[in-house]
C-alpha cells in the first residue's frame, strides 16, 4: 500500500529507483498506489518533467500496479480506496481546510459491512478521513516527521506547522 510520493520532479531524477522498488514489491504481493502531491503536480502541470512522469506512469501500469485515482477496489469484506486531494491542500505555511463535502463528492460510497482502507497522502486530514468512513488510513507526506523528538513526535510538518498531530 503506497500513499504517494514515490517520485519527485527534478531534472536529475530518472525514476529508476522507484521503478526498481515497485518491481520488487510486485513480486511479493499486489501493489496499490495512490498519488501524493509530487505525482499530482507532475501529472497536471505542464513542465519539462511531465513527459518523464507519463513514461513512469506507463511503466507502473505495465507492472500491474493498481493505481487508485479516487477509486476503490473491493475484495469481499475489504475495500482499498486511493484519494487525491487538491494541490491547494499542500500550501506551505498555511493550514488549508479540506472542503467539507470533498470526500463525499470525490470518493465512491463505501458500505458499513466493508473494512475500508484508505490511501490518503496528507495526514493533516485524518479526522476527515475517519468521518468519511475509513477504518484504516495509510498516509505519507510527512516523511516520518521532518524532525522527530522521542516521546513527543514530529516537531514540524511540511506545511511548517509546529507539533503536528499526524
Where do the model's predicted regions map?
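Short charge-dense sequence patches
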Residues: 5-13, 118-122, 145-146
Amino acid at each position: 500500500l503506497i500513499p504517494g510520493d514515490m517520485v519527485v520532479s527534478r531534472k536529475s531524477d530518472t525514476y529508476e529507483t522507484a521503478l526498481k522498488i515497485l518491481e520488487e514489491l510486485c513480486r511479493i504481493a499486489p501493489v496499490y498506489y495512490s498519488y501524493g502531491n509530487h505525482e499530482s503536480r507532475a501529472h497536471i502541470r505542464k513542465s519539462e518533467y511531465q513527459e518523464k512522469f507519463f513514461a513512469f506512469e506507463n511503466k507502473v501500469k505495465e507492472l500491474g500496479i493498481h493505481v487508485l485515482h479516487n477509486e476503490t477496489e473491493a475484495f469481499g469484506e475489504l475495500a482499498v480506496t486511493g484519494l487525491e486531494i487538491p494541490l491547494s491542500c499542500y500550501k506551505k505555511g498555511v493550514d488549508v481546510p479540506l472542503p467539507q463535502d470533498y470526500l463525499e463528492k470525490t470518493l465512491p460510497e463505501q458500505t458499513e459491512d466493508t473494512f475500508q482502507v484508505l490511501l490518503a497522502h496528507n495526514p493533516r486530514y485524518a479526522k476527515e478521513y475517519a468521518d468519511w468512513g475509513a477504518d484504516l488510513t495509510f498516509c505519507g507526506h510527512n516523511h516520518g516527521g521532518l524532525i522527530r523528538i522521542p516521546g513527543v513526535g514530529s516537531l514540524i510538518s511540511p506545511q511548517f506547522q509546529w507539533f503536528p498531530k499526524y
